[in-house]
From Swiss-Prot:
It catalyses: AMP + phosphate = alpha-D-ribose 1,5-bisphosphate + adenine; CMP + phosphate = cytosine + alpha-D-ribose 1,5-bisphosphate; UMP + phosphate = alpha-D-ribose 1,5-bisphosphate + uracil. HAMAP family: AMP_phosphorylase. One of its GO terms (molecular function) is pentosyltransferase activity. Catalyzes the conversion of AMP and phosphate to adenine and ribose 1,5-bisphosphate (R15P). Exhibits phosphorylase activity toward CMP and UMP in addition to AMP. Functions in an archaeal AMP degradation pathway, together with R15P isomerase and RubisCO. PROSITE patterns: THYMID_PHOSPHORYLASE. AMP binds at residues 168, 194-199, 203, 264, 288. The lineage of its organism: Archaea, Methanobacteriati, Methanobacteriota, Thermococci, Thermococcales. This is AMP phosphorylase.
Length: 503
């Protein structure tokens, strides 16, 4: 069957092709049937949709397809019905609780990337993993398959260091300090980061305030081999593409199976050739990982997986019970990170965590003696060497290396919440702070977010400022204020908690 391409200005969220009712009847195709579209050496798989706005002999291609593949208006393509993918039987096997072989996992991942598997089948796969779990051998096979079905980065400068935080703590701009510190010590650290999914700012969102984060693999290779580091958005690259497709479905199901989470993180590291990896697991109330036992178990899994992949992994379990630094939101965090790099001084939680993590990497890379890494990292930060390296990163990625903190625009619609009573700050709700910052417009509105005025343990008087909300519009500010009043993100208590009388 052959048809002419019609470019449609339609986004469906998946790969769909549209045909006319008459062609559907003649070709015996039904809605959601899987078909193969071929033109020359190109071939894609997509689901059928039927619409009377399509002429007979035409095939309409959605923008989802055109964002990944090039087709031109009027181009003639062949359409072939495709049967049930072989990988479906392997998904059923996992649903029964059976262990998958390496080749079966590779087939599933290849079919996800090729779009042979639709969201329904991917949902079944994710649910099967959630219920039955994966062995470490299965996770290793999954990690390698996810990496090898995408692009791989080959950097000549060795050794290649990497750092990754599993997230869950507001204001975690730590890696914007860690990367230039490590690179200034002479090590190689190509850092790919994500945008925010449920947080107020991912590392890529923050760095984008300072410079371009959308680079090609060739550009990354050039920059890293020249200056030893980069800070880029991983989503602009074709690294472990199956990961993005599974995450999209996981979000809808509100599932995050541990095996898939491990493979998701480590597949990106494998794809960029990371040899020494530091995993940061923030732990505490309101973080993704709330207990030390859970953190230790997860740490062991990362280390064991690294061994199977030929990567050396260390894990830092860090305090995650309150935000890092005082700024939450892309521009606010970029400003705080840049100020810290420029002066060598900053919020204690930010400096301590950044130099602590950087110090571990310096020891792993052999440029600092055991037990001296943090001291060396602090010296690099305070000497200005980390700032000079950050300027190089900003310039090489297309930004202004001379950007100053005061040059960064912050949302000018503000509201400050004050203490209703005196006492001590006994808790800061991470999830509430994140929710307020997002309600104010972060991360889409770069200047939106929350500025903390206090931290846990500090004494406050009635009327003292607790948080300032920043927004770029009055409407977003009003919504954030309402939410902040309802959530009460800062908990204040007096030293006397209760008086019990003598009855």
């Amino acid at each position: 069957m052959r048809a002419k391409v019609k470019i449609l200005k339609i986004k469906t969220g998946s790969f769909n092709v549209f045909i006319s009712p008459r062609d559907a009847e003649e070709w015996k195709l039904h809605p959601n049937d899987l078909v193969k579209i071929e033109s020359g050496k190109r071939s894609i798989y997509a689901s059928v949709a039927i619409g009377d706005f399509i002429e007979d002999g035409e095939v309409g291609l959605s923008q989802d397809i055109l964002s990944s593949y090039q087709f031109s208006e009027g181009e003639v393509v062949s359409i072939t019905p495709s049967g049930t993918p072989e990988s479906v039987k392997y998904i059923k096997k996992k649903m029964k609780g059976e262990k998958l072989r390496k080749v079966e996992i590779e087939t599933i991942i290849r079919d996800i990337v090729d779009r042979k598997l639709r969201n329904t089948e991917i949902s079944a796969f994710i649910t099967a993993i959630e219920i039955n779990g994966l062995s470490m051998d299965e996770i290793a096979a999954l990690t390698i398959a996810m990496a090898e079905t995408g692009d791989m980065l080959d950097i000549d400068r060795k050794p290649i260091m990497d750092v990754h935080s599993i997230g869950g703590v507001p204001g975690n701009k730590t890696n914007i300090l860690v990367v230039p510190i490590v690179a200034a010590a002479g090590l190689t650290i190509p850092k790919t980061s994500s945008r925010a999914i449920t947080s107020a700012a991912g590392t890529a969102d923050v760095v984008e305030v300072l410079t371009n984060v959308k680079l090609s693999l060739d550009e990354i290779k050039r920059i890293v081999e020249k200056i030893g580091a980069c800070l880029v958005w991983g989503g602009a690259l074709n690294l472990a593409p199956a990961d993005d497709l599974t995450i999209h479905v996981e979000r809808r199901l509100s599932l995050d199976p541990r095996g898939l989470m491990l493979a998701s993180i480590m597949s990106k590291k494998y794809a960029i050739g990371s040899q020494y990896i530091l995993i940061d697991i923030p732990t505490g109330k309101g973080a993704k990982v709330e207990t030390m036992d859970e953190a230790r178990t997860l740490a062991k899994d990362f280390i064991e997986l690294g061994k199977k992949l030929g990567q050396y992994v260390e894990v830092a379990i860090t305090y995650g019970g309150q935000p890092i630094g005082y700024a939450i939101g892309p521009a606010l965090e970029a400003k705080e990170a840049l100020e810290t790099l420029m002066t060598g001084k900053g919020p204690g939680s930010l400096v301590e965590k950044a130099t602590g993590l950087a110090g571990i990497l310096l020891e792993m890379g052999g440029v600092a003696p055991k037990g001296m890494g943090k001291k060396v990292a602090k010296e690099i930060l305070e000497s200005g060497k980390a700032y000079e390296k950050m300027k190089e990163i900003i310039e090489e990625q297309g930004g202004d290396p001379n950007i100053k903190p005061e040059d960064i625009p912050i949302g000018d619609k503000t509201y400050t919440i004050h203490a209703q009573t005196g006492g001590y700050v006994t808790g800061i709700d991470n999830r509430a702070i994140t929710a307020i910052a997002r309600e104010a417009g972060a991360p889409e509105d770069k200047g939106a977010g929350v500025r903390l005025h206090v931290k846990v343990g500090e004494k406050v008087k009635e009327g003292d400022p607790l948080i300032t909300i920043h927004a770029e519009s009055e409407s977003r500010l009003e919504k954030a204020i309402v939410l902040a009043r309802r959530l009460e993100p800062i908990k204040i208590e007096g030293m006397v908690l209760q008086v019990i009388g003598n009855i």
